[in-house]
Amino acid sequence: HLESNAWAVLSGAADPEKGKKAMDSVDKYLFTEYGIMLNAPSYTVPDDDIGFVTRVYPGVKENGSIFSHPNPWAWAAECVLGRGDRAMKFYNALCPYYQNDKIEIRESEPYSYCQFIMGKDHTAFGRARHPFMTGSGGWAYFSATRYMLGIRPDFDELHIDPCIPADWKEFSAVRKWRGAEFDIEVVNPDGVMKGVKEIDLDDVKVERIPVQEAGTCHKVKIVMG
């Protein structure tokens, strides 16, 4: 199950070893070229002790489909585990842009997350349905910016702790926070997926990025390693 496995990691309930096993199972049993399925195999016999999900057609919606909304939780979970390559693999699979060359199968716009995509247990595997009718866009933005790019605002500190593919050498972003603007440059000279070696704020090495005066602009450089 996607949700329980991802949240075992995100909640901190699983230690790193068990968390990796949980997410390895997601990759092994639930990952598809269109994204991650909710569960596998799909329920095929109604069971009132389990509930409504067992009465949904196999591979559709809550029963074994690639339900878009919880997919970004898996990206975030992999970032917690420090596995940027897999987080990007999961991100790319669900991304509508990368499914545009499969439009005859997907049957939906290449600029909208859909509520769900038919899972492997359905004869129309890969067909997307209910574009825009989903909270997936918000969760995709949340997981991509706060976990993959690692830019996380807190009450009195701006955390920057990226988890990216090992072959990413650099990236940049602009983040407005508490009325100030931060021009962020991240470099990855050693080709790591996670870990911060140095933080520079306006060309001064610092341990953290505190709140800055509203209306000001600041340069931030993060060296991974």
Task: Cite the ranges covered by each PLM segment.
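Extended ligand-binding clefts on enzyme/binding-domain cores
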Residues: 1-47
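Well-ordered alpha-helical segments within folded domains of soluble proteins
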Residues: 1-12, 19, 23, 64-79, ...
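Non-catalytic C-terminal accessory modules of carbohydrate-active enzymes
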Residues: 28-32, 43-45, 55-63, 73-225
